[in-house]
């Protein structure tokens, strides 16, 4: 049998020691492809098609090597030749196919499907430039294209195409296939569609382009700017390309396996991930009609085949489109949607549940709930809120459709790959079983009282912090003290996630330190977030944090105790560096607004403690670890919902009534900030906080300051107690494996392979 060194040298055509990193990377890509192809297995019974606008898959080389059982052999072979696998990984571009939690969840789910030997493929779009590449200049976010495609991409071009009609014009969707390896499991596929006519050269001045040149622009960017009509129309064009090509792929694959279309639900389960793929429902009905199936039967077939995952409590994220837009882009779907609307209106007199409302807007989530057999939330609290308030009318109409599937993460990437030193310590105590069965992490619990074990785990964290400090200096040009407490808030920039609450805390700390009240331990507060290009206030929050970072760094009294770092272009690669190094994980969304969150799970798994509200999956983390092992603060979801219902919240009352809060908000336009930042941005954010504050930052401010202070004190004054809490969090993280989530989806909704 060939050694790994011999295998790689044969692929490259020369000795490893003489090979470049690029040559080794391409050889490993070929090796992974051949090994993963051997794990493709025939489909018996029902197969899942997971349709999602985004898949934030991250770099694939190391993940695939781990899943295929090749990682150690490859690492050792390279080391023997004086090469580093981490250097080879740098050659790989990160795929620009997703942005936030929605896309990362989809990627984790694909990993778990393959690991559990379940037949399940993804369907999405092959974006050329992703959301955008973020850079900072003059304290402001700039957006640039984020290219990743090249001739050596993991996504392989096929000869398979499907015709798609957009605004009455014919287009041809090209299929690309990306292999998804499971850990000691099967290989599934992520199917990505694109147009051969896309022209990357039309992008100029950052991420500007002609939004009307559909043949050239359709898959350039994920979530193109929708601040104008052309941008909103472009999103519909994108969504229809994805679902029309995807529906044709599904029907073709099922037909090849013997499906006669009447029995489609026996061959396919389709999961609609949020509302972006909703048009797959009328498109499938339309296509089945072309196969000669009557409308009512087609509706039943599609309803039995499709299921819908709701990911939000924010009304703004429940997509609705003006009927006039759909009339223009997908006129072939409108007769179907009108019939579905009429059928829905026969089921209920509640006009709030209509698909087409009185203002001629088409509600995608309403269509999903009426014409799928399952609607699930993604955390226990989220599902409860959907049932009791946000979607209560639908719950009364279809109680049997509603269910909860608490989100999860793949431990292969978020532990095995990104924290190998921690894995080594865990295995030395409980063996390797947790790699396949995350619940086995609970075997760590007895070691929570073992000071020697706690010290070893603490040393892993210290080494990870040093590694992050080195990475920050190398990639961001920022020096940080690795012995300080690392406090991290990394997630999409949105007011409901409340980076602005963290901002106000940091300003408060600035004043406290200047007054001589130094914290229990130096604090490095690290942010990673992109703001949507048209989301002005979110970009103002970024500007305020970058400006505050300058002000603090220039103050000799404050700088030794407090540092603010904003990581540029936060992505999966950055997350893999930051998460293992985190001490305190910021999960501070306004209670009732975060559906689940999965960053909270990743930080917990890697031994960080959570500072958070009782929102999303924080509730279930608290239940798992116990209130004494998490730092909870702020209003409850019930209090928040009541405050919205009564409509009595006036931020000015809190601003006037709390001198510390007023001081922090006033500082935004104080001389120190104005000397380092831009008045327009800072004043606009200040005005927003004083007069609107839609996500109730001010009422939670004092509770946040107190609880965060307690966390800092515990970290500094009771290191043994802190370490014990960290180990308990790791041991209780098994519930949040996406393997558990996918097993629940399969047993309750999909019934794959049956």
Model segments located where?
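A conserved ligand/cofactor-binding region detector
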Residues: 1-754
């Amino acid at each position: 049998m060939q050694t790994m060194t011999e295998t790689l040298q044969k692929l490259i055509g020369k000795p490893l020691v003489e090979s470049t990193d690029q040559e080794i990377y391409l050889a490993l890509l070929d090796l992974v492809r051949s090994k993963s192809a051997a794990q493709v297995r025939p489909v018996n019974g029902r197969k899942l098609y997971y349709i999602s606008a985004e898949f934030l898959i991250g770099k694939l080389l190391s993940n695939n090597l781990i899943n295929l059982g090749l990682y150690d052999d490859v690492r050792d072979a390279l080391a023997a030749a004086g090469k580093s696998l981490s250097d080879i990984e740098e050659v790989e571009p990160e795929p620009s196919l997703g942005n936030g939690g929605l896309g990362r969840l989809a990627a984790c789910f694909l990993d778990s499907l393959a690991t559990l030997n379940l037949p399940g493929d993804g369907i999405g779009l092959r974006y050329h430039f992703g959301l955008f590449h973020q850079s900072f200049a003059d304290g402001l976010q700039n957006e640039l294209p984020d290219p990743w495609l090249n001739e050596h991409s993991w996504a392989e071009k096929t000869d398979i195409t499907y015709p798609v009609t957009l605004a009455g014009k014919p287009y041809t969707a090209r299929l690309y296939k990306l292999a998804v390896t499971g850990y000691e499991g099967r290989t599934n596929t992520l199917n990505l569609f694109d147009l051969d006519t896309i022209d990357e050269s039309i992008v100029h001045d950052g991420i500007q382009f002609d939004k009307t040149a559909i043949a050239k622009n359709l898959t350039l960017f994920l979530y193109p700017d929708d601040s104008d009509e052309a941008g909103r129309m472009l999103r519909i064009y994108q969504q229809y390309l994805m679902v029309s090509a995807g529906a044709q792929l599904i029907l073709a694959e099922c037909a090849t396996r013997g499906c006669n279309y009447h029995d489609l639900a026996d061959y396919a389960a389709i999961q609609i991930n949020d509302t972006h793929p909703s048009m797959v429902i009328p498109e499938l009905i339309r296509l089945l009609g072309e196969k000669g199936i009557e409308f009512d039967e087609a509706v039943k077939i599609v309803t039995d085949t499709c299921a819908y995952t709701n990911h939000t409590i924010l009304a703004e994220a429940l997509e609705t489109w003006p009927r006039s837009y759909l009339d223009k882009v997908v006129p072939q779907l409108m007769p179907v949607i009108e019939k579905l609307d009429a059928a829905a209106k026969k089921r209920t007199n509640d006009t709030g549940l209509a698909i087409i409302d009185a203002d001629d807007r088409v509600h995608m989530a309403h269509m999903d709930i009426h014409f799928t057999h399952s609607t699930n939330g993604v955390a226990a609290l989220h599902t409860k809120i959907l049932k009791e308030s946000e979607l209560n009318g639908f719950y009364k109409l279809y109680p049997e459709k509603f269910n909860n599937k608490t989100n999860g993460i793949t431990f292969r990437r978020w532990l095995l790959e990104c924290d190998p030193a921690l894995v080594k310590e865990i295995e030395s105590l409980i063996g390797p079983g947790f790699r396949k069965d995350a619940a086995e992490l609970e075997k760590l619990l007895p070691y929570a009282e073992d000071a020697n074990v706690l010290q070893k785990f603490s040393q892993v964290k210290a080494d990870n912090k040093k590694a992050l400090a080195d990475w920050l200096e190398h990639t961001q040009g920022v020096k940080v003290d690795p012995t300080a407490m690392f406090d991290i808030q990394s997630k999409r920039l949105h007011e409901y996630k409340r980076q602005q609450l963290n901002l106000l805390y940091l300003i408060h700390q600035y004043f406290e330190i200047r007054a001589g009240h130094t914290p229990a331990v130096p604090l490095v507060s690290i942010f990673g977030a992109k703001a949507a290009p048209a989301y002005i206030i979110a970009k103002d929050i970024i500007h305020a944090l970058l400006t505050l970072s300058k002000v603090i760094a220039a103050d000799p009294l404050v700088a030794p105790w407090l540092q603010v770092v904003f990581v540029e272009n936060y992505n999966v690669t950055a997350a893999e560096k930051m998460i293992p190094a985190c001490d305190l994980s910021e999960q501070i969304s306004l209670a009732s607004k975060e559906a689940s969150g999965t960053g909270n799970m990743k930080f917990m798994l890697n031994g960080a403690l959570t500072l958070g509200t009782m929102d999303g999956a924080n509730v279930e983390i608290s239940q798992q670890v116990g209130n004494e092992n998490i730092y909870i603060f702020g209003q409850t979801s019930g209090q928040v919902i009541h405050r919205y219902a009564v409509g009595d919240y006036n931020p000015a009352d809190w601003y006037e009534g709390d001198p510390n809060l007023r001081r922090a908000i006033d500082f935004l336009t104080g001389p120190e900030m104005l000397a380092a930042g831009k008045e327009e941005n800072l004043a606009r954010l200040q005005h927003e906080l004083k007069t609107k504050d839609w996500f109730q930052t001010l009422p939670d401010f004092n509770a946040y300051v107190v609880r965060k202070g307690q966390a800092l004190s515990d970290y500094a004054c009771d290191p043994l107690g802190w370490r014990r809490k960290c180990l308990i969090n790791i041991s209780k993280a098994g519930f949040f494996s996406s393997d558990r989530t996918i097993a629940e989806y399969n047993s309750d909704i999909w019934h794959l392979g049956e």
